[in-house]
């Protein structure tokens, strides 16, 4: 006999969810008011209460965005059915509405701070809930809406959305059986970068000017401390911007859209117009020499170290002791940048000139490009291109975050994923994003295509699925009691969990890259003129 649709009461009102495959699911729950009209480009405001029963059977729409690499077939922006700007929503899966004290895990999706949606099939929280976790996913503002640097508006609105979502969890998760005192945030790529920023957002920034501009007088509006106990950051990007660089990028997008780069003009512009302009600017980023190394990427948006919302870059904040009481699990995939080389059609086509360009741009002092060439004798231009991009963008920022946290006295765990994606005859290797479908598991049959199909193919081997089950179990153990099953990372022993077939525990394996980058200090990326 089928169970009736479950109903619960939270702060703003009554919700009706669904009972699906042994767990309870509630989707599209607003955690803030729609950020349009007078609230466009403002810090998030608490959601309005509602009368009667609100149906929570469908996902809310994501912020306006162009199609992206991950899950490119997912509905986006105004193409999403019923998109009326109600972008700021959460989704909750729970094993037992009558339970109490269950560990809570909050997933923050990636997508270059420009695209992505909690409605992606790969982010289904059912497997986590079946293992005894209350799993939360959320949407947040992206692109110009969330990370454009706009006069008279707070920076990092996407990060402020995430703080608001975590406050919603703290206030409401008990109704779903969760423990608000045992919350773990986890995310991948831009989601991991957002988590790194949240670790540094302790409310110490000078928010007076931003509060004046936004009218916000809510205590803790820019303070993430106390909202989560543990953090899992998968493939942390090294891109954090200065306000000048972020403002210049926003001005270029405004010019592309045909509007002045002012608050009034941008707030009056259709979100779809700005998203389309962002995509066109992304396609020609190499023309903007003043953007420095950023011009060689496809990431025109990043968190902004503005001194108010985000006081310091995460590496420096953690080294100074920020978030020392937060237990951190972080790691990366071995072949991070391979995904982007394959997706761009450049596999096997990288020239010596291409390799020299990125080595000159990214290889750190004192060795510079020679360090990579000497450290990898006989490596092809394509291999050098991939290595330095992987290191600069993901691998070394992740390692340095782990080191900063460990040196300051924080409990830190490190991993590297080495198992390879089976799709496309294995050319992707252990590429960026592979950890996501492994953790969440393959979507149900008949689900629309997405990143799982792109990376795992139609019939992934049982051994790879089992490895994903093990990773999920380790993540859940960490979220439950802080112990994923291997020893903490330290600068002497560098203990690292290797997710391969079979798994292992070794000293950090990327020794050449670690040595080349040991004197580098990740911080903020500047405008070059």
Which residues does each PLM region occupy?
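Non-catalytic accessory segments of hydrolases
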Residues: 1-156, 216, 297, 449-485, ...
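Short Gly/aromatic-enriched secondary-structure transition segments
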Residues: 21, 25-49, 342-362, 489-495
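Serine-hydrolase-like catalytic core of hydrolytic proteins
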Residues: 28, 70-263, 285, 317-340
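A structural signal for the main folded, soluble domain(s) of proteins
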Residues: 65-80, 122-124, 130, 154-155, ...
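Surface-exposed helix-capping loop/turn segments at secondary-structure junctions
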Residues: 97-101, 173-182, 260-261, 405-413, ...
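Non-transmembrane alpha-helical segments in soluble domains
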Residues: 105, 134-137, 163-166, 170, ...
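Substrate-gating cap/lid region and adjacent catalytic-acid/histidine neighborhood
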Residues: 265, 274-461, 474
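Mature extracytoplasmic/periplasmic domains
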Residues: 485-509
């Amino acid at each position: 006999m089928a169970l009736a649709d479950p109903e619960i009461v939270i702060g703003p009102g009554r919700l009706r969810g669904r009972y699906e495959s042994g767990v309870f699911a509630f989707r599209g729950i607003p955690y803030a008011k729609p950020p349009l009209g007078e609230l466009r480009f403002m810090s998030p405001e608490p959601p309005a209460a509602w009368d009667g029963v609100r149906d929570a059977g469908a996902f809310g729409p994501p912020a306006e965005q162009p199609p992206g690499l991950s899950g490119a077939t997912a509905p986006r922006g105004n193409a999403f059915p019923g998109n009326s700007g109600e972008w700021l929503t959460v989704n909750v899966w729970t094993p037992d509405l009558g339970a109490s004290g269950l560990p809570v895990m909050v997933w923050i999706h990636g997508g270059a701070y420009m695209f992505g949606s909690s409605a992606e099939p790969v982010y289904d929280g059912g497997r986590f809930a079946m293992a005894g976790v209350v799993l939360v996913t959320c949407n947040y503002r992206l692109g110009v809406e969330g990370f454009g640097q706009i006069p008279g508006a707070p920076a990092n609105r996407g990060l402020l959305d995430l703080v608001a979502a975590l406050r919603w969890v703290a206030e409401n998760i008990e109704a779903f059986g969760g423990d608000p005192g045992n919350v773990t945030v986890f995310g991948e790529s831009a989601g991991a970068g957002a988590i790194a920023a949240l670790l540094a957002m302790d409310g110490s920034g000078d928010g007076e000017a931003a509060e004046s501009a936004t009218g916000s007088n809510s205590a803790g509006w820019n303070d993430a401390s106390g909202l989560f106990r543990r953090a899992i950051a998968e493939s942390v990007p090294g891109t954090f911007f200065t306000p000048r660089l972020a403002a210049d990028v926003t001005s270029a997008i405004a010019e592309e859209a045909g509007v002045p780069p002012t608050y009034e003009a941008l707030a009056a512009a259709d979100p779809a117009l700005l998203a389309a302009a962002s995509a066109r600017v992304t396609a020609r980023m190499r023309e903007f020499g003043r953007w420095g190394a950023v011009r060689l990427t496809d990431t025109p948006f990043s968190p902004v170290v503005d001194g108010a919302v985000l006081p310091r870059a995460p590496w420096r904040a953690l080294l100074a002791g920020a978030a020392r009481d937060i237990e951190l699990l972080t790691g990366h995939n071995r072949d991070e940048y391979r995904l982007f080389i394959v997706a761009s059609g450049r596999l096997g086509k990288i020239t010596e000139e291409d390799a020299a360009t990125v080595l000159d741009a990214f290889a750190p002092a004192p060795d510079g490009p020679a360090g990579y060439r000497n450290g990898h004798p006989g490596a092809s231009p394509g291999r050098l291109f991939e290595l330095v991009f992987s290191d600069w963008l993901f691998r070394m920022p992740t390692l340095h975050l782990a080191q900063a946290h460990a040196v300051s006295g924080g409990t830190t765990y490190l991993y590297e994923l080495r198992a390879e994606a089976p799709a496309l005859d294995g050319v992707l290797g252990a590429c960026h994003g592979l950890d996501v479908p492994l953790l969440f598991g393959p979507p149900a049959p008949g689900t629309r295509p997405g990143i799982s199909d792109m990376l795992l193919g139609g019939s992934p081997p049982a051994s790879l699925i089992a490895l994903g089950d093990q990773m999920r179990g380790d993540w859940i153990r960490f979220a439950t009691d802080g112990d994923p099953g291997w020893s903490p990372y330290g600068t002497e022993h560098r203990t690292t969990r290797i997710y391969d077939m079979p798994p292992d525990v070794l000293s950090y394996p990327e020794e050449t890259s670690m040595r080349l980058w040991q004197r580098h200090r990740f911080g903020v990326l500047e405008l070059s003129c």
